[in-house]
């Protein structure tokens, strides 16, 4: 499959294929940790962790397939699925924090809001067929930085090391957005965007591990 790809698409494919393998490697240990962890509001900690892992795996796998496939019709469909998966990843990342760290009406309201954004993003992608990538980027960033609304309860209820890893995650994604926005103008900028996505996901994985430990 890869022999038909140009060098940029090879880079785009490999950056997230490696991330797929890493996600599969960490999934079971993280789920086991979630099963035994004792958070202040533990009832939904396994659900929140599972949603994060599922979102991360879906995002990296759909991205890998999109960049690896060369057949135009399949590639167009996978592009839409790739963008939808990012919505799922963002909502999945905050699910554990919303339901097990923040909790209460604030946490659950934010949880519902984020997954409503996923639904809106899915509908928008299907209707618009992925014609507005910059609008999607704006929604990605808005969903990601909605954590600003819960910074104080996060700081109060999370280990501070985990908190700063979540901050680092947001910084990585925001820097990466610059390269995504310029990827049609510069070679390999999309692969650089992928690297920042991996760094952001890794930061959140570390934060989750510290939170559950």
Predicted regions and their residues:
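Multi-pass alpha-helical transmembrane bundles in non-GPCR membrane proteins
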Residues: 1-213
């Amino acid at each position: 499959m890869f022999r038909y790809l140009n060098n940029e698409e090879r880079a785009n494919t490999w950056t997230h294929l490696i991330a797929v393998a890493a996600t599969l490697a960490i999934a079971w240990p993280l789920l086991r940790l979630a099963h035994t962890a004792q958070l202040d509001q533990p009832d939904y900690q396994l659900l929140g962790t599972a949603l994060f892992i599922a979102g991360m795996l879906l995002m990296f796998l759909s991205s890998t397939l999109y960049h690896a496939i060369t057949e135009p019709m399949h590639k167009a469909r996978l592009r839409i699925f790739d963008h939808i998966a990012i919505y799922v990843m963002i909502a999945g990342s905050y699910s554990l924090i919303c339901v097990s760290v923040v909790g209460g009406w604030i946490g659950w309201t934010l949880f519902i809001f984020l997954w409503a954004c996923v639904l809106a993003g899915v509908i928008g992608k299907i209707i618009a067929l992925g014609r507005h990538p910059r609008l999607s980027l704006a929604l990605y960033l808005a969903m990601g930085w909605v954590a600003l609304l819960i910074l104080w309860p996060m700081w109060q209820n999370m280990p501070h090391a985990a908190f700063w890893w979540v901050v680092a995650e947001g910084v990585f994604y925001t820097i990466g957005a610059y390269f995504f926005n310029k990827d049609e103008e510069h070679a390999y900028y999309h692969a650089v965007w992928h690297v920042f996505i991996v760094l952001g996901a890794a930061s959140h994985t570390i934060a989750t591990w510290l939170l559950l430990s």
